[in-house]
Curated annotation (Swiss-Prot):
It comes from the Archaea. This is Uncharacterized protein MJ1020. Residues 51-173 form the HD domain. InterPro entries: HD/PDEase_dom, HD_domain, MJ1020-like. It holds the Pfam family HD. SUPFAM superfamilies: HD-domain/PDEase-like. PANTHER family: METAL-DEPENDENT PHOSPHOHYDROLASE, HD SUPERFAMILY-RELATED.
Length: 259
């Protein structure tokens, strides 16, 4: 999976999840927040993509992992704790994943908190169109929990939140960077990020979810440990995820470096 993926999970949504996804991608407030998130993160801070493409990738991958877990007999938390349906959990995952980074439009610092309060009205207004009031409010709190806990250092307490956090970490291929690596300006972060060719999510043998990271250079191991590893650590679903890395074609990331 590179960043030119076809969003198979998003494109195959049906029923209420599809209607909500169609509404999300057309929502002017959501689109503006995502645009401003990239202006803040990429344009002003020199970070990687936190806009619409990132939102779609995280949503797609989170839904894929939720389905794998459900197939393996692991109930989503909203199903287990609130007597909801799998479709309800799918909606929670979709909304939480798509909106998790909109708080970057305010500031990168505590962006998970900014994302939660910016998402509140958006999520409530959407859910109240499809669900009775009490259920809409229940689902809203689950979405906000998932958004808030996607950041490292905050433990996810639901399956839905967990798959979103891990999915966030899977978007780490070299194509995510909107800032070309400056010649002779390399560090371990930029070299490692440039070494990630693609990420593949599939059913695992030892654990339900297997994430395979294909590298062009062993320097990418740093990115796996520092980005994806930290997301998994705090996701609350660590016991359900295994990660494998392999170098497909060893090639240099840089020719020379100046210290």
């Amino acid at each position: 999976m590179g960043r030119d993926m076809d969003f198979e999970e998003l494109n195959s949504l049906q029923g209420i999840p599809k209607m909500i996804y169609d509404e999300l991608i057309k929502n002017k407030k959501v689109n503006t927040f995502l645009k401003m998130s990239n202006i803040m993160a990429v344009g002003r801070l020199g970070y990687n993509d936190h806009g619409k493409t990132h939102a779609k990738i995280v949503a797609n991958n989170a839904i894929k992992m939720l389905k794998i877990l459900y197939k393996k007999g692991i109930e989503p938390s909203f199903v287990k704790d609130c007597k909801g349906s799998f479709e309800d959990s799918l909606v929670i995952t979709l909304l939480g994943a798509y909106l998790h980074d909109i708080g970057n439009s305010v500031h990168r610092d505590i962006h998970h908190l900014h994302s939660a309060y910016l998402a509140l009205d958006i999520v409530e207004n959407i859910l109240k169109k499809y669900y009775k009031e009490e259920k809409a409010y229940q689902m809203t709190t689950e979405v906000l929990h998932a958004i808030y806990s996607h950041s490292e250092g905050i433990m996810g307490l639901t399956i839905e939140a967990g798959v979103i956090a891990v999915a966030d970490g899977t978007d780490m291929t070299k194509g995510r960077s909107r800032i070309p690596i400056c010649k002779k300006c390399y560090d371990i972060h930029s070299v490692s990020a440039a070494s990630i060719e693609r990420v593949e999510i599939k059913e695992g043998d030892e654990k339900p979810i297997q994430i395979e990271v294909i590298l062009s250079n062993e320097a990418g191991i740093f990115q796996i440990q520092e980005v994806l590893g930290e997301k998994i650590k705090w996701s609350g679903i660590k016991n359900y995820v295994s990660v494998y890395a392999r170098v497909e074609k060893e090639k240099p990331v840089f020719e020379e470096i100046t210290i």
